[in-house]
Amino acid sequence: MSSKSELESLLNKIVKSNDETEVSKALKEIEDNNEYIEKKQLRSLLTMHDKKFKDQCLIPMNNLYVKYNDIVGKDRNLQNETAFVDRDIRVLESTLQYIIENKNSHNTNHGGCNKTKNSSKDKLLDK
C-alpha cells in the first residue's frame, strides 16, 4: 500500500508542480502564439480580405448595377408594352375572325341574294 500512496504523492507533485519544464515552456509558447495569431494576424487578414473583396467585387458590381439599372427598368417597361400590343393584336384577330364567321353565316342564311358589288370592306374581309 505504501507504494500506491507513494505513487499518488509523486503524481500530485508532478501535476501541481510550479517548476517549468521544456514541455511546459513549449506549450506556453504555442498558446501565446495561438492567441497572437487569433487576435492580431487573423483579424488583420480578415480585414485585408474584406477590403480586397469590396474593391474587386462589391464596388464594381454596385457600379454595374447603378449603370444598367435604368436600362433594365426601360426594358421591363418595353416588355409590358409588348405584352399590351400582343394582347391588342389577339383581340383584333379574334374580332376579325368573328366578323368573317358572321359574314359567312349571314351569306349562307340568306343564300347570298343580298350580295352587292365587292366593297372595300368585303375585300378586306375576304383576305
UniProtKB/Swiss-Prot annotation:
Disulfide bonds: none annotated. It is found in: Endosome. It comes from Vanderwaltozyma polyspora (strain ATCC 22028 / DSM 70294 / BCRC 21397 / CBS 2163 / NBRC 10782 / NRRL Y-8283 / UCD 57-17). One of its GO terms (biological process) is endosome organization. GO terms for cellular component: BLOC-1 complex; endosome. This is Biogenesis of lysosome-related organelles complex 1 subunit BLS1. Residues 105-117 have a biased composition (Polar residues). Belongs to the BLOC1S1 family. Its main location: other. Residues 103-127 are annotated as: Disordered. Signal peptide: none annotated. Component of the biogenesis of lysosome-related organelles complex-1 (BLOC-1), a complex involved in endosomal cargo sorting. Keywords: Endosome, Transport. Component of the biogenesis of lysosome-related organelles complex-1 (BLOC-1).
